[in-house]
Design a protein with these regions (language model features):
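N-terminal ligand-binding/catalytic initiation module
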Residues: 1-97
Length: 98
């Protein structure tokens, strides 16, 4: 499985290619050719965990966010997240993007 952190992603981004992918994502959105269920959210003790899954014929991914407001007092971000990408045919984990 591929693990990419912020620096890895920044080094590998092709802005022209990224714009092409964003345009493709808008086409998929406009056509309705995706499945994105309501976001499961877990809230406890002023902390929040949110899952944002989405599935198309060519991709399967889940964005996970945590919201911990008290982290500010620790010098940490109050919102953290990552994306898990899976093979859309087998479900096998392919990559984690931090």
């Amino acid at each position: 499985m591929l693990l990419l952190n912020k620096k890895d992603i920044e080094k590998s981004v092709d802005l022209d290619g990224m714009m092409d992918q964003i345009e493709e994502a808008y086409k998929i959105f406009e056509s309705g050719a995706y499945y994105m269920p309501p976001r499961p959210t877990v809230e406890h003790d002023n902390k929040t965990l949110i899952y944002m899954p989405c599935y198309t014929k060519d991709s399967l991914g889940t964005k996970m966010l945590t919201i911990f407001p008290e982290n500010v007092s620790l010098g940490l971000p109050s919102i953290d997240g990552l994306v898990l990408m899976n093979d859309p045919k087998t479900g096998k984990p392919l990559a984690i993007l931090d």
